[in-house]
């Protein structure tokens, strides 16, 4: 693969969305990092120092179908599942500034309150994170409870994790009958006032609560859970699925008058998007 000289001074990461199951990654004959174990979730390596700018670069991936980790092998290989191996989800590169948002988690409740936990890479002191929300349906900006279009979080320390909170007005909560969705945008502004990174994700404002001897509540209303178990599986692709297959499965489940799905492991992101769009609640059995 080609790496242009214009990438100089930036961080380059390679992402794997799913490799079954132990993976050793080499860039130009050198290890990208420790062997990755676990076949169902995304992982990445910072390969900046291994690249040859302005030249051809070589990626090698060595995959073992059986894991050297006994616990992982028991979870992935000893159950009554079809056994597959290889790179079965997308692989891509991301070019990032030296200081960037590495990972973030959003929690948006049905009253419009939003909390963001953002992991920073590099010393972000002096930067700002700007958060905004718009409707997925019509693209209209959603105003905060004090009438602003954004919330600005100044980073006054060198802590890796930055916590941001805000409240948005007049939101329509997500529910199984009305799966209303929004887009949250996080922008990173450097001390010179330039936006150096933008991240977006779809969100639903919802509150899920569990009460012993009572059940599950969604947005303060008891939810009668009617669901099924589902494997990520394609007749002609094995573990490699598609957005079209995800939509077909989600529609079939919805047509069966169900509102919930339990997976055996993290599914493809496009299936979670379909669940969000159609009003299906989702639970993972194994986080990895």
Where are these regions (language model features)?
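Short beta-strand edge segments in extracellular beta-sheet folds
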Residues: 94, 150, 202-206
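Extracellular recognition modules
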Residues: 60-62, 183-187
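Beta-strand-rich binding/interaction modules
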Residues: 25-27, 113-153
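Extracellular interdomain linker/stem segments of modular secreted and single-pass surface proteins
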Residues: 96-99, 205-211
């Amino acid at each position: 693969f080609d790496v242009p000289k214009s990438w100089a001074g930036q961080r380059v990461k390679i992402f794997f969305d799913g490799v079954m199951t132990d993976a050793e990654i080499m860039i130009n004959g050198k290890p990208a990092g420790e062997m990755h174990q676990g076949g169902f979730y995304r992982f990445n390596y910072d390969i900046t120092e291994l690249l040859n700018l302005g030249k051809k670069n070589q990626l090698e991936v060595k995959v073992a179908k059986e894991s050297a980790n006994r616990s992982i092998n028991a979870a992935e290989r000893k159950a009554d599942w079809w056994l597959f191996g290889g790179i079965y989800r997308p692989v891509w590169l991301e070019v990032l500034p030296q200081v960037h948002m590495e990972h973030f988690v959003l929690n948006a409740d049905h009253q419009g309150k939003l909390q963001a936990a953002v992991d920073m890479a590099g010393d972000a002191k002096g930067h700002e994170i700007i958060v905004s929300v718009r409707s997925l349906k019509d693209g209209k900006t959603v105003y905060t409870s004090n009438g602003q279009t954004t919330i600005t979080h100044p980073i006054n320390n060198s802590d890796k994790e930055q916590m941001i909170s805000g409240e948005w007005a007049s939101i329509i909560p997500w529910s199984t009958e009305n799966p209303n969705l929004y887009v949250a945008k996080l922008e990173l502004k450097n001390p010179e006032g330039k936006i150096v990174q933008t991240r977006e994700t779809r969100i639903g404002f919802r509150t899920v609560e569990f009460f012993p001897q009572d059940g599950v509540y969604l947005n303060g209303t008891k939810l009668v859970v009617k669901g099924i178990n589902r494997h990520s599986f394609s007749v002609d692709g094995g573990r490699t699925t598609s957005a079209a297959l995800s939509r077909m499965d989600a529609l079939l489940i919805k047509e069966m008058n169900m509102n919930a799905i339990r997976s055996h492991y993290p599914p493809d992101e496009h299936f979670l998007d379909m669940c969000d769009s159609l009003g299906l609640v989702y639970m993972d059995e194994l986080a990895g």
